[in-house]
């Protein structure tokens, strides 16, 4: 199962999954991607 949480450290519009994933890894997650109408960065973690 994969859990998701919105990134606390990512600032601005999420335009690229790569940058989002890097920020998420710094927050202790396994990765992340941009999602939603407002293009927010969501971090993923196996749970």
From Swiss-Prot:
Which domain of life, per UniProt? Eukaryota
Q: Can you tell me where the transmembrane regions are?
A: none
Q: Which residues form the signal peptide?
A: none
Give the GO biological process terms. Answer: defense response to fungus; killing of cells of another organism
User: Which residues bear the site annotation Interaction with trypsin?
Assistant: 11
PROSITE patterns from the xrefs?
GAMMA_THIONIN (PS00940)
Q: Key word Lipid metabolism present in the record?
A: no
Assigned keywords, A-Z: Antimicrobial, Disulfide bond, Fungicide, Plant defense
Cystine pairings recorded for this chain: 3-47, 14-34, 20-41, 24-43
Q: Name one Pfam family in it.
A: Gamma-thionin
By its UniProt entry, which Gene3D superfamilies does this protein fall under? Knottin, scorpion toxin-like
SMART domains reported for this sequence: Knot1
Q: How does it assemble?
A: Monomer and homodimer.
Q: Report the protein's function.
A: Inhibits trypsin but not chymotrypsin.
* Record-stated family: Belongs to the DEFL family. Protease inhibitor I18 (RTI/MTI-2) subfamily.
Name of the protein this chain belongs to = Defensin-like protein 1
């Amino acid at each position: 199962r994969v859990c998701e949480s919105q990134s606390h450290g990512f600032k601005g519009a999420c335009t690229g999954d790569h940058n989002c994933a890097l920020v998420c890894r710094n927050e202790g997650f396994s990765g992340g991607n941009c999602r939603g109408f407002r293009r927010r960065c969501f971090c993923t973690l196996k749970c």
